[in-house]
């Protein structure tokens, strides 16, 4: 698609400003042609828009900033651009005050996120990633909620070495963050080998098709040759243009009956429609999901995705590009808090959005096909696939792959397994690891290593269905603890649930240190969202399969009071639930909390409707 063609929006005709998208503006009174950055400023667009325009396809001052050895940081503007390269600049907030008192610079480091479509890596790649963790990243890998790895604590002087090592594994970090299509997730259900293969291939195809084409990543991090002339034909972004997308864009591929990728929480999704032999006949397309919001600003809200229509396999890539480019052209580039696709659809309506997608695909979407999701969790332990291969899902608390004193030796154990494993590894959207494609003859050897290193095949029902974001001390947005707090809370809740005979009842619980929603707390039956030190908003009433948003139940609950707040609800659930009724459905039916229909309704009728 031609990113330099003016495209009309439902608001009216667009001005032909290459790369800026369909935003009207008044040119300043001058005889000379205005620059693109001036046009962006004149349009009142967000700072990031003219930052992208002036970046020379995401180069900015990054190369020069890496040479400034007197600081562990990069400039604020380059801190925005480096996200497109898969990194966030962070500092250790545990020691921030101490360093400030001593008049020292913050303890800066970088979080590096990989692009691994579908979350599949080979044993050889695992060993390289393990070596990076032990050499540059504090002896830890972190499996994320979006099916990839993150490294934390990489200092600036080690960035290029780390990137070179990642490249040696035939992996990269391009577009793992930033205003682009990010890492594409795919279903990992190993029991459906054929459907998983189709889902994984679609995820890879979307990732490759929607990948930025700039050579900046290889040039800056691997000392690759710069494209002669800077902006010749090879440097034109054929899909994105110079301003890329208004905001992040997340894509997933799901295979019913499992919704472990949380398809309704993402901008774009594809739901596999299967025949009786588990073969993919096409895909339902979902659009407009997203978790992030801002405390106290009701024009920001989480939203579950709508089902847009059905496409045949040969049209799936066209649909992906069409949806993303409509968001490119219609999305809000003036206010980043309202820039995600969910707000675009709320603003223009699903029918208008569908019509534009169909126009770009060149055909009508078919009506959605029936589908059913049963849960959004993982299947733990061994599972045999249709092809006779075996797959072992391990429970990894908060996705933190490290050796724990007196506990599981995740880093060492998985390294040892990678040395003998003949299949592959798969990450799940619930931060767990699957040792996949194990021949039957190798199961005993894998089992022995799992036992030797104390790796966990499962845990309590509520712990198995828990997710936490990183939060403190590295995330600059965190208002409260999450990963370091949730395990202790789960121990308290396990005691409470056991007292009411609910210890085997699966209940989803997720915690985030801020309302950006990285752990997708607004579609968990119990959601904790940080408000301040040891204070959380408590959300209840989401669907067990991730298809319905929760509702705010209590504001600013102290961490010490969360167990006592939930205990009466557990007691009522144990006493009055119907057969097969999940906790999130029960608290709505029993009248403890209102049901959220979607989007703007999230902020309506909040609080407990009656005492527990």
From Swiss-Prot:
GO terms for cellular component: sulfite reductase complex (NADPH). Residues 1-32 are annotated as: Disordered. [4Fe-4S] cluster binds at residues 469, 475, 514, 518. Pfam families: NIR_SIR, NIR_SIR_ferr. It catalyses: hydrogen sulfide + 3 NADP(+) + 3 H2O = sulfite + 3 NADPH + 4 H(+). It comes from Methylorubrum populi (strain ATCC BAA-705 / NCIMB 13946 / BJ001). Siroheme binds at residue 518. Pathway: Sulfur metabolism; hydrogen sulfide biosynthesis; hydrogen sulfide from sulfite (NADPH route): step 1/1. One of its GO terms (molecular function) is sulfite reductase (ferredoxin) activity. The keyword Amino-acid biosynthesis applies. Alpha(8)-beta(8). The alpha component is a flavoprotein, the beta component is a hemoprotein. HAMAP family: CysI. This is Sulfite reductase [NADPH] hemoprotein beta-component. Its EC number is 1.8.1.2. GO terms for biological process: cysteine biosynthetic process; hydrogen sulfide biosynthetic process; sulfate assimilation. Component of the sulfite reductase complex that catalyzes the 6-electron reduction of sulfite to sulfide. This is one of several activities required for the biosynthesis of L-cysteine from sulfate. Its cofactor is siroheme; [4Fe-4S] cluster. Gene3D superfamilies: Sulfite Reductase Hemoprotein, domain 1 (3.30.413.10). Binds 1 siroheme per subunit. SUPFAM superfamilies: Nitrite and sulphite reductase 4Fe-4S domain-like (SSF56014), Nitrite/Sulfite reductase N-terminal domain-like (SSF55124). PANTHER family: SULFITE REDUCTASE [NADPH] SUBUNIT BETA, SULFITE REDUCTASE [NADPH] SUBUNIT BETA-RELATED. Keywords: 4Fe-4S, Amino-acid biosynthesis, Cysteine biosynthesis, Heme, Iron, Iron-sulfur, Metal-binding, NADP, Oxidoreductase. The gene is cysI. Belongs to the nitrite and sulfite reductase 4Fe-4S domain family.
